[in-house]
Each structure stands twice: as C-alpha cells, then as structure tokens.
C-alpha cells in the first residue's frame, strides 16, 4: 500500500527534502504532497482573477485559490507532518494542523524544544512530536513497514 504524506509548514529550510530523501533511501512506499512552497507564486495565486491594490483582498483571493490545493491534499493524505520553525510564525501550519485534527488524520509535529509551550495544544492533538527530519523518516519507516 502506498502512503500519502502531506508536508505542511515552514518553507525556509530544506526539511521537506531531507524527509523525502530519507524515505527514498529506505525505499519507503510513500507519495509526498505539499502546499505551494514558492512564496511569491503562492502570494500571487489569485492575481489572474482580479487586480487588487488592497493587500487584504489580494491575500484573500490568493488564499482561497491556494486552499483548493491544500484542502484536497489534506483530505487525501494518510498522515501529515507539520513543521514549525522558530524564526517565523507559521499561521498556515497551525491551520493545517487544525484541519488534520478535525478530519481525524494522524499527524506528527516537527519543531525544536524551544517552542513546546506555544504549541502545547497542537502537540496534544498530534500522534507524535519530532525534533529532526530524520526522526520523521524513522516514524514513517515504522508505520509503513509493519
């Protein structure tokens, strides 16, 4: 059985690539999905619909276009991985974690020890917490091979 894993969250480091490479090295039967991680094109996702000089409305229409992809991929996934970095506030990641929880999709949080307290409710809903992409790969190895 091929597993579908949704990778959500922080876009400024290569954590996704590390997980994908680690899973490939172990030959895990996993398909990985993610929201658009290119910040500029994500912010401009709705620009073709209407020109907007007001930042709120530009963000609003682009977020709706992005949500078409995000909602469908989250609904289809078997497990989610939600990465919270310590440098930026990842509101989208928190929203995705809430959506995963609401849909009863198991998910793993990935973040440093230094932000445990602000993420306590998110971590409480998660099935596991990891600090490194390698730990995520080990969890995926275990759940997909047993």
What are these model-predicted stretches?
Residues 1-146:
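Conserved catalytic or regulatory cores that recognize and/or transform ribose-phosphate-containing ligands
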């Amino acid at each position: 059985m091929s597993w579908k894993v949704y990778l959500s969250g922080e876009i400024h480091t290569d954590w996704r690539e590390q997980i994908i490479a680690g899973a490939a090295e172990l030959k895990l039967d996993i398909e990985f999905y993610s929201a658009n991680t290119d910040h500029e094109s994500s912010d401009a996702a709705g620009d073709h619909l209407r020109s907007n000089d007001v930042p709120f409305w530009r963000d609003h229409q682009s977020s709706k276009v992005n949500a078409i992809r995000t909602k469908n991929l989250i609904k289809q996934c078997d497990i989610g991985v939600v990465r919270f970095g310590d440098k930026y506030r990842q509101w989208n990641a928190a929203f995705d974690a809430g959506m995963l929880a609401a849909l009863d999709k198991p998910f793993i949080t990935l973040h440093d020890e230094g932000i445990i307290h602000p993420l306590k409710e998110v971590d409480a809903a998660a099935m596991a917490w990891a600090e490194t992409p390698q730990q995520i790969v080990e969890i995926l190895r275990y759940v997909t091979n047993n």
